[in-house]
């Protein structure tokens, strides 16, 4: 286990309701200190609710995406400047579901990360391979390509303000989880790629694991030297499970 602080981020995806969110957020807020720092990334309509309910607490909140554009005729887009106006702390960029269903490219993800940073928002940059790519032995090739697009677009100073999340696509929402050793190997590889830019930044950078993290496997994953927490999907919708992961 590393000395880096742990971070556990809940990605609610396309889930939530005003009443349900209020109950979930209040339970998380009332739980007190956990081993890991906690954050929740909610759908855009609920960000103001997160801001209100979590005000004054140690729980951070963020968005699940951010536009690569800054302003203009881009219907449906939400700019980083808009998010930052009311205190958004994080923005997920490059999630595999955005890459797969919305055709986002590595270059677009890099621009989104830059837009977030320009407005004081920490981008959570997601990388990960499909099952076919893993079975073809292309895991490192794929995640390196995805990460390098971001590394090449940012200064060393900016790199010190991002979070990376490794999310093997074959383990998202499938119930399958990479073994702790498989995940650690990719995390170590990713940290090595960052170290090629700056060793100090690499040593400090949080690299999260995302892929069917649950209370019963979080502790083992989080003991790995280069796994600094988790990007949590389904388990983040239940306060008890999310908090258990935060305490792992």
Curated annotation (Swiss-Prot):
EC number annotated for this UniProt entry: 5.3.1.1
Q: What is its main location?
A: cytoplasm
InterPro entries in the cross-refs: Aldolase_TIM, TIM_sf, TrioseP_Isoase_bac/euk, Triosephosphate_isomerase, Triosephosphate_isomerase_AS
Record-given protein name? Triosephosphate isomerase
**Uppermost EC category:** isomerase
Q: HAMAP family under this entry?
A: TIM_B
Please report which protein family the annotation says this sequence is part of: Belongs to the triosephosphate isomerase family.
Is Cytoplasm included in the keywords of this UniProt record?
Answer: yes
Where it sits in the cell: the answer is: Cytoplasm
Keyword Isomerase on entry: yes
Q: Which residues bind substrate?
A: 11-13, 173, 212, 233-234
Per the entry, what this protein does is: Involved in the gluconeogenesis. Catalyzes stereospecifically the conversion of dihydroxyacetone phosphate (DHAP) to D-glyceraldehyde-3-phosphate (G3P).
The protein's annotated pathway? Carbohydrate biosynthesis; gluconeogenesis; Carbohydrate degradation; glycolysis; D-glyceraldehyde 3-phosphate from glycerone phosphate: step 1/1
Designated gene of the protein = tpiA
In alphabetical order, the GO MF annotations are: triose-phosphate isomerase activity
Q: Which domain of life is it from?
A: Bacteria
User: Which SUPFAM superfamilies does UniProt cross-reference here?
Assistant: Triosephosphate isomerase (TIM) (SSF51351)
Identify one Gene Ontology CC term for this UniProt entry: cytosol
Q: Which reaction does it catalyse?
A: D-glyceraldehyde 3-phosphate = dihydroxyacetone phosphate
Q: Which Pfam families match?
A: TIM (PF00121)
